Amino acid sequence: MTDHKIGTRDEWLAARLELLEAEKELTRRSDELAQRRQDLPWVRIDKDYRFDTEEGAASLADLFSGRSQLLIYHFMFGPDYTAGCPSCSAIADGFDGSVVHLANHDVTLCAVSRAPLAKLQAYKQRMGWSFPWASSYDSDFNHDFGVAHTKEEWQSGAVEYNFRTMDVAPSETGEEIPFLNQIASSVGTDWPTYRQEGPGMSAFVLEDGVVYHTYSTYERGVDALWGMYQWLDRAPLGRNESGFWWRRHDEYDL
């Protein structure tokens, strides 16, 4: 016998209609927040960031691929990783279906990581992806946009991420928390090396030959980009998580 509340169809409908009003309010608030994102002031980018792409060396403006808007997913794949972050990989599984639609709405979607291009290409082939993915190896891009931190920064006890200073334990290795060490092992490294990268997304606009930064989000801010969680939040048991359960799509038994 289930422990969950059981009701009649009429009781379900009454509760569902009450929830529907809350969902509608959330949608209205989401629309308002989307407009506030668009209303943020733009910040001019004068630094000459360089990237390696499948087409060759590229500037930030080149990543727009002839369009006026650029969305970059900061994919956690550091130079010392042997594979991409499994969480970022789960998010990226949804990119290919969106790329063509965005491209036909004047928006380019691109992933950027610090790993050398050859590593990104090999992993991209393994995952069966086709979306654009650029390497920012030897560039300040990831650090400047808050998704790369040195071991020295972590050892200082304070790291700037997600628009705040994070208080961290300099001696933390990940061994104290098996979950953290398990995630690090999944990319072939240890926790201090793994956490030098961080997830996030940034938006840019190109106007009159000038690139402007318009928006960035990190941590739970990328939840909305993680397709499987949008489905799980509507499943009977929700996220129902216990530890590091997700894998790359080619690592499941089914």
Residue ranges with predicted function:
Residues M1-H105, A122-G128, P132, D138-L254:
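Non-globular targeting/processing and membrane-anchoring segments
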Residues A103-L120:
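Catalytic nucleophile loop
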